[in-house]
From Swiss-Prot:
The 4 large subunits of the cytochrome b6-f complex are cytochrome b6, subunit IV (17 kDa polypeptide, PetD), cytochrome f and the Rieske protein, while the 4 small subunits are PetG, PetL, PetM and PetN. The complex functions as a dimer. Keywords: Electron transport, Membrane, Photosynthesis, Thylakoid, Transmembrane, Transmembrane helix, Transport. InterPro entries: Cytochr_b6-f_cplx_su8_sf, Cytochrome_b6-f_cplx_su8. Belongs to the PetN family. It is a single-pass membrane protein. It holds the Pfam family PetN. Its main location: membrane. It comes from the Bacteria. HAMAP family: Cytb6_f_PetN. This is Cytochrome b6-f complex subunit 8.
Amino acid sequence: MAILTLGWVSLLVVFTWSIAMVVWGRNGL
């Protein structure tokens, strides 16, 4: 169960980071 939770957390972090990169890229940062 811990591995499954870790997988979901890591997936969420990667997804959030990707969205942040796109937003910052559009803002010219």
